[in-house]
From Swiss-Prot:
Similarity annotation: Belongs to the natriuretic peptide family.
Function as written in the Swiss-Prot or TrEMBL entry: Exhibits natriuretic and vasodepressant activity. Has cGMP-stimulating activity. May help to regulate body fluid homeostasis in a variety of aquatic environments.
Annotated organism of origin: Takifugu rubripes (Japanese pufferfish)
Protein name listed in UniProt: C-type natriuretic peptide 2
Prosegment location in residue numbers: 23-103
Amino acid sequence: MAASSSSFVPLVLLFLAIPVEPRPSMTRDEAQVLRALFGARLSSIISTPVNTDDIAELLPRRPGPPRSFGASPGALRGLTRGSEGGSRFLLDFLQQQSKTTRRGRSSMVGGRGCFGMKIDRIGSISGLGC
């Protein structure tokens, strides 16, 4: 045991005496990274500062309809009455989603799973779709 510990100490001292040089860092500034990713033209557009006046021109002048899409049908009907309501397709989709999210475990009784009827390999119907 003493022989192995005596050979271990000089080995540790040898490793501590050897100078270790780190690799040169590969960090580049943000301008070089943008130029490499997007090219010179797009990187100059991205790096230019934005005026608050430009942002104000893009924002609507008057407030729009409320943006909360609750699951209540009254909230969805209120959007169709407004002059700037969403498209009928989107509202129908949201109403359908609110109907399907209300289903609980009781609606899956009778062999119905998440995606309708499930038939096993042997032909028996199961409701283990979810």
